[in-house]
C-alpha cells in the first residue's frame, strides 16, 4: 500500500500584522501536515488565529515567515495572480453564506470555477456541474435558482461548486453556521460521505461538536496549536440525524 501524500504542509508559519505602532502576532509558528483523504476540523475561539490560518490555507494571504506547501507546491513566494490560479485549481471553498450568484441556476453557479479552466468546453462544464450536483443529492434541482431553494439546498449547491474542479482539498468555513440543527446534520452526513469517497476536507469551525464527526481535530489558541489529535471514535452524522425529533408540521 502506497503511503498517502501530504496535501497541506505548514512549516513554522508566522503571520504578523502592523496595526499602528503595534505588531499583532496572529500566527506564532504553526506547523502541521494534512494528508490525502483526511477530514480535519480546525477549531478556535475568536482571536485564536483561526481566520488568519484559513486565509493562509486558502492562498488568500502569504506567511510573514515559514513555508506553506499546497499539494507539493510552495505558496509563500507566489504573486497574487499565481495564487489565484493555484487556488482555483486546487481548492474548493464552501462558505457560511453560500456565496451563490442570484438569479442564476444551480448548474450555472456550479460551472463558475470551470470558466477559468481552458481544458473544459462549454458542454464539458455543463456535464461536470450536473455530475457534481448529483453527487450532493440535487439532481432534481439543476435549474432552480437561489430564491427557489432552502438554505440547506443552497449549501449543497455551494458544496457541488467546491467539488466540480476535483480539487486537492475542500476548505469549508463555518459551513453549517447559518443552518438549523437538522440541516446542519444533513450537511455533516454529506461531508462524511465525501470523506468516505476519499475527498480531503478541512472544516474550520467554532463549534466543538463538529470535531466528533471528523477524523482529526486541530485546536488553535493565541496563534499556536494547542492540540492536534486523531479521532478514534468518529460518530455517525446519519445516526445523529435519525435520532433528532421529527420536524413538526405547522
Q: Which ranges hold each PLM region?
A:
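ABC family nucleotide-binding domain
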Residues: 6-220
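Conserved beta-strand-loop-alpha-helix hinge in the C-terminal portion
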Residues: 224-249
Amino acid at each position: 500500500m502506497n503511503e498517502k501524500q501530504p496535501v497541506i504542509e505548514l512549516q513554522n508559519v508566522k503571520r504578523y500584522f502592523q496595526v499602528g505602532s503595534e505588531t499583532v502576532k496572529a500566527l506564532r509558528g504553526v506547523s502541521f501536515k494534512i494528508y490525502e483523504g483526511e477530514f480535519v476540523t480546525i477549531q478556535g475561539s475568536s482571536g485564536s488565529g483561526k481566520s488568519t490560518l484559513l486565509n493562509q490555507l486558502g492562498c488568500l494571504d502569504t506567511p510573514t515567515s515559514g513555508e506553506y506547501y499546497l499539494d507539493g507546491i510552495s505558496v509563500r513566494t507566489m504573486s497574487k495572480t499565481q495564487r489565484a490560479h493555484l487556488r482555483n485549481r486546487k481548492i474548493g471553498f464552501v462558505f457560511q453564506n453560500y456565496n451563490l450568484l442570484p438569479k442564476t441556476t444551480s448548474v450555472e453557479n456550479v460551472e463558475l470555477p470551470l470558466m477559468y479552466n481552458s481544458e473544459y468546453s462549454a458542454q464539458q462544464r455543463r456535464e461536470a456541474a450536473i455530475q457534481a450536483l448529483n453527487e450532493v443529492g440535487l439532481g432534481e434541482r439543476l435549474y432552480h435558482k437561489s430564491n427557489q431553494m432552502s438554505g440547506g439546498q443552497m449549501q449543497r449547491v455551494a458544496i457541488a461548486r467546491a467539488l466540480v474542479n476535483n480539487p486537492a482539498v475542500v476548505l469549508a468555513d463555518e459551513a453549517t453556521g447559518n443552518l438549523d440543527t437538522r440541516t446542519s446534520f444533513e450537511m455533516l452526513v454529506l461531508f462524511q460521505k465525501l470523506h468516505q469517497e476519499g475527498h480531503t476536507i478541512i472544516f474550520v469551525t467554532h463549534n466543538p461538536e463538529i470535531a466528533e464527526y471528523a477524523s482529526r481535530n486541530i485546536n488553535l489558541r493565541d496563534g499556536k496549536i494547542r492540540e492536534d489529535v486523531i479521532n478514534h471514535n468518529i460518530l455517525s452524522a446519519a445516526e445523529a440525524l435519525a435520532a433528532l425529533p421529527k420536524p413538526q408540521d405547522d
